């Protein structure tokens, strides 16, 4: 019997020494923060691994891309080289067919000139085109938001944030409340 008690005492001591929750990380502690402190706290909570794990896992790695003007001629060059190699290595291909294939293939210079003509828009014209498209898209999206009633929802969310910030500053708030805004 004394041996059983010594084992139970040993297990109890081991279990009591297990790491516990960090005191400042409790989700039920009241935090009173205003201004920059509140923003820092919000960034800490929303940017931490435990709260933002799903958002980080959904992100896809972005591929590095070069400028499109450089990519296009190189792809044209590769296609031309592949076609030339195919024409050389197919011995049974009649000369007439080889001639028609090479006639159909535009020269590399022609393809590069047509690509550069398309890309040599005046900077001001390019800027105007982009601004016009952005304005059209904004007008359409605002009209759709008004039709769907979503603009009221975003206002409510902003008002909720304002009241929560006032609450955190004056009374205090819980980490879970701040985490809901992430």
Swiss-Prot record:
Q: Where is the signal peptide?
A: 1-24
Give the record's keywords alphabetically: Cleavage on pair of basic residues, Disulfide bond, Hormone, Pyrrolidone carboxylic acid, Secreted, Signal
Q: Which residues form the propeptide?
A: 57-154, 159-160
State the protein's name: Prorelaxin
SUBUNIT field = Heterodimer of a B chain and an A chain linked by two disulfide bonds.
* GO terms under cellular component: extracellular region
Pyrrolidone carboxylic acid: modified positions:
25
Query: What are the GO BP annotations of this UniProt entry?
Result: blastocyst growth; flagellated sperm motility; oocyte maturation; positive regulation of acrosome reaction; positive regulation of D-glucose import; positive regulation of epithelial cell proliferation
Subcellular localization: Secreted
Instruction: Give all cystine bridges in this chain.
Output: 34-169, 46-182, 168-173
């Amino acid at each position: 019997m004394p041996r059983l008690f010594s084992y139970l005492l040993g297990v109890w001591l081991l279990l009591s020494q297990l790491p516990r929750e960090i005191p400042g990380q409790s989700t039920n502690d009241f935090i009173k923060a205003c201004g920059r402190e509140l923003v820092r706290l919000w960034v800490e909570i929303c940017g931490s691994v435990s709260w933002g794990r799903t958002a980080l896992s959904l992100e896809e790695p972005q591929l590095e891309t070069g400028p499109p003007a450089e990519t296009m001629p190189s792809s044209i060059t590769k296609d031309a080289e592949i076609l030339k190699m195919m024409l050389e290595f197919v011995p049974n291909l009649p000369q007439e067919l080889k001639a028609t294939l090479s006639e159909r293939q535009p020269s590399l210079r022609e393809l590069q000139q047509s690509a550069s003509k398309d890309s040599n828009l005046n900077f001001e014209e390019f800027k105007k085109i982009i601004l016009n498209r952005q304005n059209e898209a904004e007008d359409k999206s605002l009209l759709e938001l008004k039709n769907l009633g979503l603009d009221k929802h975003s206002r409510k969310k902003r008002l909720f944030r304002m009241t929560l910030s006032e609450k955190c500053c004056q009374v205090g708030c819980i980490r879970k409340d701040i985490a809901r805004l992430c």
